[in-house]
Amino acid sequence: MELKRVVVTGLGAITPLGNTLPETWEGIINGKSGAGPITQFDASKFKTQYACEVKGFDPLTVMDRKEARKCDRYSLFAINAAKQAIDDAAMDLDKEDKNRIGVIFASGIGGIKTFDEEVLGYAKIKDSIGPKFNPFFIPKMISDIAAGHISMR
């Protein structure tokens, strides 16, 4: 088997230290911690009150509101970081051979925020129509959808 050469040409990052690679790197070299009080949900009933949350993230920097509503937060991070990496590599995707560009992405669980919102919403609905899920529930939640969104761009 012949091994193929892989080249990393650009980097992007969305982290608790910053929403860009330079912000993240600056935090790392200055010994900054990304930990802080949990703000994404009510954690008052949990022993742990601190987490490393991404703060100040705006998905509208890379997509419109309608498109963003179809994605879970983890996918929005992935799409934004990929856009940063493409920009960092100074790639013009219109001029590149897309058959020579790949996306490698890993996620342990996928859209847990979407899952949580849908399950809680399902339990609360008590009308004549009955409970229903958002039509984007499964597409927003599956763990490989972030790579799909990146690839479609």
Language model region names:
Residues 1-153:
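Conserved "HGTGT" condensation-loop signature of ketosynthase/thiolase-family condensing enzymes
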